[in-house]
């Protein structure tokens, strides 16, 4: 990359392709994270449209100011994306220092995620129409999201050969393609077995656990729609997403005394500080194991 090239001369797609390669191959970031970072950087490049060698903190601040209609949390995410991008520019020799180091991140209030009560979780499970194999799939999806605390990308990416139901666990591919073993309780396991037994014979060799009516992997958007549709059927008016089940999973475990570091391992968090957000519900002493304390593992 030449330092004296303008963004309008150095096609945005070329920059993004090179940056995309860096994120995937050198930073080992997940596909979703790479897509998010590149989306933010693309918006910035179109806003900046000048000599990259002259990039400074004022340009970063101006771009963030132009996005003032978005939340502080989104601004913080964008700044993180740009900081990573500028680190790459330093590595490439385009700029000497990272201008984002001089930009203060937006002050964020303590984020308390929305959670479902145990009773609301049960209402959603009961609201699923299991008269077809697709209904059995939806029930199994909800049970796995809540029973294992998976991210939606982890759930729709779950492969049949990653199920070890006799051993009571599943193998999950998380962020950065990092693997972890996650215990699975009886209700989620039974729902999976019931669903897999009902899948059409023509899809018996399908690679992914959760598939659509054509036998291909269920998309993230389809999973979102399934959760929202089921919430409406259950009469729940909260803003519900697949991630709500993950929040509820963690909160209910900690409420019932599960050890914070066990929950951290289950969620696949790099740092226990990320998991500590769930301690806002209950300050009681944490003890025993996840299996003992999840409300749907009894």
Task: List the predicted regions and their residue ranges.
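Conserved catalytic core of the tyrosine transesterase superfamily
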Residues: 1-298
